[in-house]
Amino acid sequence: WFSDTFEVGTSGQINTQWQPCFTAHGDKTEYESMVKTFAAATIGFMKKKPNVDSIRICQNDVIAGENDVANCTCDACLAAYAHYGNTIAGAMLTFTNDVADKVNEYLDSDQAIADGFSSNKELNIVVLAYGTASKAPVLRNAIGDIVFDEAGKGQPADLYRFIKDDTGAIRSVLQKKENGENEKLTCHKRVTVEYANTTANYVRSFYEVENQLYANAVKSWAGLGGKIYVWLYQVNYHMYFYPYNSFESLVENLRFFKTYNASYVYNQGTFENPNCGGFAKLREYLGSKFEFNCNYNYGEVVDFWFKNYFAEAEPYMRQYFNELQANQRAKESKTGGGIHSNALAGEDIWPQGMINHWVKLFDKAYKAIEHYKETDPEKYEILYKNILIESQFPRLVLCTTYASTYNATQLKVLRKE
């Protein structure tokens, strides 16, 4: 039930051979066995962890240090991939629907009641629309463009299964309803789609032209009838400690996805380090507010955060934030907005004079809270740490880009401050 091909990367064999084959290589008997096995495993997991409400079906992501999300390349998977517009999502959704049908059959049974489940149990079997599955398997015209309905959503395509015949050749078989109509590929009961795209520009919103391709993918998935989950990205993962200007776009993206009935959002940020600079804490706060109510006023929320997070140091920290954003916008043609980029550093992006100016702003910020040392030491420590976290980025630039302008003692001080 896995791909029988592989590629060789810089670290040796990589994970194409370990990608799941969602068609069972076109073998009808093996496919039925695969569906039964996965459905039984899902039901078994549900019994062990009855409070879990979502189970994901996805491709493998990163194995042996290689970022390889290629799909299975057997003849059946390649046929499905080509048929649905260069996406493996058609095969994935078909398989997920078949699994869900069997899980639903169990949940509607007397046995499920005896096991302590009701027929309306909350359970989402989630197709991860990621990698080569990010494009929806929807109706397209002769040149491959998506055909949207009047509401601007994708329209379901006819359902085909890709089955090996007696000669071993793969045949595409159109599925028919009992009334003779073509069956459509839609999300069955309890099937949910989670959209996750790592190639979008997350310093821009999905309303903007830079992300039109990805916005259209979301609109396409929204037409297939299932819930929409969203996995968003909020940092450049190749340059983790550099600022990523996704504050306003984060809010606009939440509003965009809400328009298409998204019910769950995971904003992946600096999860490996809880104390990154670049105003990661502000981004987390924005998520905590706007994920529950997209109608807040962005400016008012940002103002509230700065006043309460930095107290008397707010004017200096807000000036730093505003200038940081202005510089990022001005240099966006050089840095881009990708989350896997090495273009964020350099003297042309961060002039030394500007960095030194920001360091002086931090000195003023520390001085503004100095009086709390005596009057409220606990508050002082909190505010001091909040400022210190944000000071990491300009000091990082001085210690790396401009390291040659300091002696060893000075660099040691910068790194330890």
Please place each PLM-identified region on the residue numbering.
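Catalytic domains of carbohydrate-active enzymes that cleave complex glycans
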Residues: 261, 287-417
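Gly/Pro-rich turn-and-neighbor structural signature
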Residues: 19, 23-27, 31-222, 232
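Short flexible/disordered coil segments
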Residues: 127-149, 154-158, 225-238, 252-260, ...
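Structured mid-domain segments that build the active-site/substrate or prosthetic-cofactor binding neighborhood
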Residues: 30-34, 44-47, 195, 201, ...
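Glycine-rich, aromatic-flanked loop segments that form ligand/cofactor-binding clefts
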Residues: 1-14, 54-59, 122-126, 268
